[in-house]
Curated annotation (Swiss-Prot):
GO terms for molecular function: transmembrane signaling receptor activity. Belongs to the methyl-accepting chemotaxis (MCP) protein family. This is Chemoreceptor protein A. One of its GO terms (biological process) is chemotaxis. Residues 397-633 form the Methyl-accepting transducer domain. Pfam families: HAMP, MCPsignal, PAS_9. InterPro entries: Chemotax_Me-accpt_rcpt, HAMP_dom, MCPsignal_dom, PAC, PAS, PAS-assoc_C, PAS-like_dom_sf. The chain crosses the membrane at residues 11-31. The keyword Transmembrane applies. The gene is dcrA. Its main location: membrane. One of its GO terms (cellular component) is plasma membrane. It is found in: Cell membrane. Residues 330-382 form the PAC domain.
């Protein structure tokens, strides 16, 4: 209200001062103009009177008629009681006057007015005319002083020695006129004061009703807004500047209210605990997440000191006062204990709020509840321990895999050597079979020519017996070698079975490694960023396990091919051995026949045909055996090649296991 009264007083003082100043100027100018008008009238009257007087006395004076001149002055005295006329000589002595008492006296002694005397003395020296208002004996007179020059027509009386013969001084009593002038001035001043008061009153009433009262209402509404009440309304009647000001203020308040509601909505929409304080560290806003921490309704803390709010939770540090005082951002960690004993680990960040001049007028405190982070840190630590345990298990598996791979490499080396030996034996069998085939062919050729050489039957029969004995012996050797080859192939099949069991162990290890890698990847995914490095390790372990499984499958396929080839070779060798045994039996029969050739010459032809037929069958069987042995040799070489490939794959598995172990060691570090 003091501001409103001050505004009204200022407006009234301004209006009154301006009006008073204007009316004073008008009053002074009016008085001056009235005085000047009055003086102008008096001056023109005095000039006319002096000219009339001069005209009246000019004739008698020019004739030297002293009596006539005196009569003229007497007539003026009788006719114009308010006029005093004096004529002096060049010494200032009064020679003629409307008053007989002052004749022959100096004008300076009669007229007690220093200002007039100065003009009078000047008029005695030079030809001049002066008018002046003067006060003589308390009365106002308008004085007209005129020099009387020594004109030629005056020389006959006064001579030529004095240029100025004297002066005519006429004093007109203007006291009534001046009194009337003052009365008019007083009336003018009175009217001016009345008009001033009326104007000030009307302006005051108008200003109070049309301006001050509306400004006071605006100030009152502004005061409510200052107190935080933005629900007020402004008047909008009229179309003047104050109405537009009301409309602008209403629009501004609406904008501020909407902006404040928007800001409050933004603050309420923030999900982290937050508080806003003013320059005196009082809480202006606190959101629901912050109230959830203290387990109290938010409205209970509005307007309270923020430091007291924090101290009730055991926080001695005044985190906002420091920012309000220094104007710098501040952050740190605190622990807040709620009334129910729950302790919240909190991280705070406080920033100053500044006005448009850069002065700190508040602060905003953002509180981050670290409870979940602490719980996550604890879970991460547990997961880290679990991951280390899994890493130990993976290390054990890798070491086991390395040992198994080393053993498998050793076994594959032995298998490769056995396959090499089998290939060598098969080569020897093939050579023997080729020799046997040549022998059987020769037997068939000899049997064919036996019929033509019947006459040599006894000798040839003896030779045939010997050859048949050799054939039986060679056939027995072929059978023995075939049986040895079959045994070697059986041993190769058994060792292939052993390799299959080792591959199964490797498959089980690879499956277990893949499962452990999958579990480790799951645990690492649960651990989030902390387990990302181990997730990479687990992925590498899983890839190594997959490569191991692929390699073992290739080895299994190679072993299966070896086993199949070995079984086929065993079957062929069994058939070959049986055929060789049949051949050996037939060769023995042939020997018996040849033994009885001498006694049974008549049946030589038939026996020779039988021998030829048997020889042809033996040649055919020998060719089949030769082909089978060649096939066995090819299979053995294939087995040897696959064994080498399996050894390379197993060595790769061993390298992968060592790499897995190195990765796990790196993860531990």
């Amino acid at each position: 209200m003091s501001t409103q009264r001050s505004l009204g007083t200022k407006v009234m003082l301004l209006v009154s001062g301006i009006s008073l100043f204007v009316y004073l100027i008008l009053a002074v100018l009016t008085s001056y103009w009235q005085r000047q008008s009055a003086l102008t009238l008096i001056d023109s009257g005095a000039v006319r009177a002096s000219e009339l007087l001069l005209d009246a006395i000019a004739d008698p004076m020019s004739k030297g008629n002293d009596t006539g001149t005196t009569e003229k002055f007497d007539a003026i005295a009788r006719r114009y009681a308010d006029i005093r006329a004096y004529m002096t000589d060049f010494r200032g002595n009064i020679t003629y006057s409307t008053s007989k008492d002052v004749l022959r006296r100096d004008l300076a002694d009669v007229v007690q007015a220093p200002a007039l005397l100065d003009k009078f003395n000047a008029a005695l020296k030079t030809d001049s005319r002066e008018e002046q208002l003067a006060t003589i004996d308390g009365m106002a007179f308008y004085a007209t002083i005129r020099s009387i020059p020594n004109a030629p027509e005056c020389h006959h009386c006064h001579g030529r020695s004095q240029p100025i013969l004297g002066t005519l001084v006429m004093l007109q009593d203007v006291t009534p006129a001046m009194s009337e002038l003052r009365l008019h001035q007083y009336e003018t001043v009175g009217l001016s004061v009345g008009g001033l008061l009326l104007l000030v009153g009307v302006l005051s009433l108008f200003m109070r009703r049309a301006v001050i009262s509306r400004v006071q209402r605006i100030a009152a509404v502004s005061g409510q807004i200052e107190q935080g009440d933005y629900s007020v309304s402004f008047e909008h009647d009229g179309n003047d500047e104050l109405t537009r000001l009301n409309a602008n203020l209403a629009s501004m308040v609406t904008t501020i209210r909407d902006q404040m509601q928007y800001n409050r909505s933004v603050l309420e929409g923030i999900i982290v605990p937050l508080a806003v304080v003013d320059a005196r560290n009082r809480i202006e806003f606190i959101n629901q997440p912050m109230c959830t921490i203290v387990s109290t309704a938010c409205h209970e803390y509005s307007g309270k000191d923020f430091s007291a709010f924090m101290q009730q939770g055991g926080v001695e540090e005044d985190i906002t006062a420091t920012v309000l005082k220094g104007g710098n951002n501040q952050q740190g960690n605190i622990s807040y204990r709620r009334d129910d004993g729950t302790v919240f680990p909190l991280h705070y960040e406080v920033s100053p709020l500044r006005d448009d001049r850069g002065a700190v007028n508040g602060a905003i405190a953002v509180i981050i509840d670290l409870t979940q982070e602490e719980e996550a840190r604890r879970r991460i630590e547990e997961q880290r321990i679990n991951l280390l345990r899994v890493a130990d298990e993976v290390t054990g598996v890798a070491e086991t895999l390395v040992r198994a791979a080393e053993a498998l490499v050793t076994r594959m080396g032995e298998l490769e050597r056995d396959a090499t030996e089998a290939a060598s034996e098969t080569t020897q069998v093939a050579t023997a079979m080729e020799e046997m085939n040549v022998t059987v062919t020769e037997v068939a050729r000899n049997a064919s020519s036996t019929a033509e050489m019947a006459d040599l039957a006894n000798g040839e029969a003896q030779s045939g017996g010997t050859e048949m004995a050799n054939t039986v012996r060679e056939t027995r050797q072929v059978a023995q070698r075939t049986e040895d080859l079959a045994e070697s192939l059986h041993e190769l099949a058994r060792r292939a079975d052993n390799i299959g069991r080792v591959i199964e162990v490797i498959n089980e290890i690879a499956d277990q490694t893949n499962l452990l890698a999958l579990n480790a990847a799951i645990e690492a995914a649960r651990a989030g960023d902390a387990g990302r490095g181990f997730a990479v390790v687990a992925d590498e372990v899983r890839k190594l396990a997959e490569k191991t499984m692929v390699a073992t499958r290739e080895v299994e396929q190679a072993i299966a091919a070896i086993q199949q080839g070995s079984n086929d070779a065993v079957e062929v060798m069994t058939e070959t051995r049986q055929q060789v045994e049949v051949t050996a039996g037939k060769a023995e029969d042939t020997g018996k026949v040849l033994s009885g050739i001498v006694g049974r010459a008549e049946s030589i032809a038939d026996m020779v045909r039988n021998i030829a037929t048997a020889s042809e069958q033996q040649s055919s069987t020998s060719d089949e055996i030769n082909r089978n042995v060649t096939r066995i040799n090819d299979l053995t070489e294939g087995i040897q090649r696959r064994v080498r490939e399996a050894g390379d794959a197993i060595r790769q598995v061993e390298g992968m296991a060592q790499r897995l172990e190195a990765l796990v060691d790196g993860f531990r570090k």
